[in-house]
Amino acid sequence: MTQTLSQLENSGAFIERHIGPDAAQQQEMLNAVGAQSLNALTGQIVPKDIQLATPPQVGAPATEYAALAELKAIASRNKRFTSYIGMGYTAVQLPPVILRNMLENPGWYTAYTPYQPEVSQGRLEALLNFQQVTLDLTGLDMASASLLDEATAAAEAMAMAKRVSKLKNANRFFVASDVHPQTLDVVRTRAETFGFEVIVDDAQKVLDHQDVFGVLLQQVGTTGEIHDYTALISELKSRKIVVSVAADIMALVLLTAPGKQGADIVFGSAQRFGVPMGYGGPHAAFFAAKDEYKRSMPGRIIGVSKDAAGNTALRMAMQTREQHIRREKANSNICTSQVLLANIASLYAVYHGPVGLKRIANRIHRLTDILAAGLQQKGLKLRHAHYFDTLCVEVADKAGVLARAEAAEINLRSDILNAVGITLDETTTRENVMQLFSVLLGDNHGLDIDTLDKDVAHDSRSIQAAMLRDDEILTHPVFNRYHSETEMMRYMHSLERKDLALNQAMIPLGSCTMKLNAAAEMIPITWPEFAELHPFCPPEQAEGYQQMIAQLADWLVKLTGYDAVCMQPNSGAQGEYAGLLAIRHYHESRNEGHRDICLIPASAHGTNPASAHMAGMQVVVVACDKNGNIDLTDLRAKAEQAGDNLSCIMVTYPSTHGVYEETIREVCEVVHQFGGQVYLDGANMNAQVGITSPGFIGADVSHLNLHKTFCIPHGGGGPGMGPIGVKAHLAPFVPGHSVVQIEGMLTRQGAVSAAPFGSASILPISWMYIRMMGAEGLKKASQVAILNANYIASRLQDAFPVLYTGRDGRVAHECILDIRPLKEETGISELDIAKRLIDYGFHAPTMSFPVAGTLMVEPTESESKVELDRFIDAMLAIRAEIDQVKAGVWPLEDNPLVNAPHIQSELVAEWAHPYSREVAVFPAGVADKYWPTVKRLDDVYGDRNLFCSCVPISEYQ
């Protein structure tokens, strides 16, 4: 045997698991595109002056088992104290049926945002359920699904309040002094760029302040007090002030709906509906508003529509509000939200139903009453008489209480003057309450739970009578039917079957990087060492998290060529916002705050101009030339015109046109010459890793889509993570946090998300990916992504012209297929092709972005040659079908393309089409059939007849 022990150990085994084509397939594809090797292909495509001489030093690869063991050892450094800190985060009991069938199920977590509703009806239904939960609990008319976290939702509520306010000259936003501190932090950050003045005061003093356009109240204050704001809201409404209320989703089960009290906007975190704390996230926020404000709402809204056969079908409604269409005029820059977490919360509500939720909420409140009664019986004073689950307990010996708590492995809230905060949750037991008595009173307290229970059961006044909910919630059958595990399992499976995810087929969406989310990468996110930590626990309890985050940040620094990485942003769009704020604050530190012009190429993703607008910048569009590259002449002219007001350029690399622009360094130099900064959008980082880097190219800041390049799954529309990498001069200006000091970050800036490290519990996914791939594997992944894209382009270019290419006719990691000539000749559109691909078992490529009338295809490195060939064969077969239409064999108004997708029920219905049933549903090469459950959606009907709550179950059948 000639192999060495090192070869037999095969530490790089995962590289071959992650990359789809094996060595033989890679060589076949290289031959097809006319390249001798991966290195030769890369050398032809990537400009020589930006190619790295040596790959970033992120270590050797590790096997799945070795990496899991290494990460488990790191995770074990976290200390799992029982946390009663509260502040918007509590421990939960995620029902195992949801854990196994959703959170751990690639049929749910590998799906994409439901832009293609025909292959997304399952998660759209779950999201509609989420909206129904929100509507029932808030008492409002319109809900979205969903936002990034509660603090971000507060900032969105402020922005929305200004949009809808009739007080156009008012510029002040009032925040009640007992909102959560992290919420206030994010609101202040957003207000600064919008030029709003934030006033923080006792809610009852709001009327003392003039020129207020909006008010933020918190129904259950951060230290636990329940407020009856009915009269105050009425007075504010009489003065035309827009009222937003932050609410606790579990408290709303028992408390009066803020919408019934007159609130215009209600929002909060859905975390305690089954989603672990995860050291801060990911968690979905709910958001609701009055019907009259629906077109000013941020985020996705799921609406009920009809398909081509008149059947009920769901879709994302009113998309003209959103960044991918309205760009800088959008209501928000939100793209990725928190769909997977919203769906967990919605299914938590389905599983427990109204009776179960009331039992949980009442049990939490009863235990809180028992704790309060015992403490008061022993002479301790509560700061608030009215509470749901949180007590603010005044203590004489605070240091002693905290010391006893630490000894008992308990976290209390400690930042309240002369008091401690205690928040109970659904995991709290009577034994926990007895332990809390010992911490606060000493071991010889003599209290008995059952005796206290009898007392409070007959005389609880901790919720005001006027604040008790008097209406029914969750009356729709979906919340009253699936309470056995068998029924719940089958319901979830019925939803999953309606959707197309990566566990069934390639999702070739350009600019989305739908690559493998390996099982080994996903396993650690449910480890209790990661899942159960409170984001505001003492840092010494989170040493495992700190080590993992620091190591991941170090790897990302090396891979990007930057000097520092900030992990706080919760999505790519939020990363853009954070990076632009860093640029803004950098200019201000140099007394150049007047620099507010952001140059953006015409091809940019819609989040770019939307984020620039949010950061207080003016957007100036830079033209692209006929080859899709940034027009340098126009860039110089626009930069010179901006002059001393130039803030930055936002550029994507490789470009959204799917090519490595030869002049990217010159672009950076022009902007720097005029005093601007270069923001390089990290959306296409999958074509850079190991080959080049933003820092090496000359950029100053980038966000990284960890849910693209670094394998966090898309979850059907979230979660995501968008950390930013920065050069040293921008490092002091990345987001900070008002509650937690971020180690190693010397920043004085406000936060952009509620938790200091964003959605920290999904960072292990990216850690595992980098650890298992190593430097060698990461570079190879980028190279194979490029190879796969060029293979598709070369095989399809005769049937569907590739719109933009670089040197030697090559593309980067994605290609744009131009459908416009075919449409002119035949009337068949890119939409028809996209829908016909469903019949062939594929999700559509990205439609009409960045160029109308095109399809953008990104195969990623994870797809094998077999799957690529299946996609290519499907596209060629569709081209042959188009030729049949062109030849007059099938009429334009009745052919397999314009009628696509076809559903099962059509097979047994009367058939009057000029093509066979077999052509319709089993076109050439289709063996493993995916069946959509609805035909093509009627978008116009959906927006003209907006309906965004649950419909009768019979409508889905």
Curated annotation (Swiss-Prot):
Enzyme Commission code(s) on record: 1.4.4.2
S-S pairs: none
Record-level Gene Ontology MF annotations: glycine binding; glycine dehydrogenase (decarboxylating) activity; pyridoxal phosphate binding
NCBIfam families in alphabetical order: gcvP, PRK04366.1
GO CC aspect terms: cytosol; glycine cleavage complex
Entry similarity comment: Belongs to the GcvP family.
EC class of the enzyme, as a word: oxidoreductase
UniProt key word Oxidoreductase: yes
Subunit (UniProt): The glycine cleavage system is composed of four proteins: P, T, L and H.
Catalytic activity, as annotated: N(6)-[(R)-lipoyl]-L-lysyl-[glycine-cleavage complex H protein] + glycine + H(+) = N(6)-[(R)-S(8)-aminomethyldihydrolipoyl]-L-lysyl-[glycine-cleavage complex H protein] + CO2
The protein's role, per its UniProt record: The glycine cleavage system catalyzes the degradation of glycine. The P protein binds the alpha-amino group of glycine through its pyridoxal phosphate cofactor; CO(2) is released and the remaining methylamine moiety is then transferred to the lipoamide cofactor of the H protein.
Full protein name: Glycine dehydrogenase (decarboxylating)
Gene3D superfamilies (alphabetical): Aspartate Aminotransferase, domain 1, Type I PLP-dependent aspartate aminotransferase-like (Major domain)
Listed GO biological process terms: glycine decarboxylation via glycine cleavage system
UniProt keywords, alphabetically: Oxidoreductase, Pyridoxal phosphate
Chain positions found as N6-(pyridoxal phosphate)lysine: 708
Cofactor section: pyridoxal 5'-phosphate
Top-level taxon: Bacteria
InterPro entries the UniProt entry points to: GcvP, GDC-P_C, GDC-P_N, GDC_P, PyrdxlP-dep_Trfase, PyrdxlP-dep_Trfase_major, PyrdxlP-dep_Trfase_small
Oxidoreductase in keyword set: yes
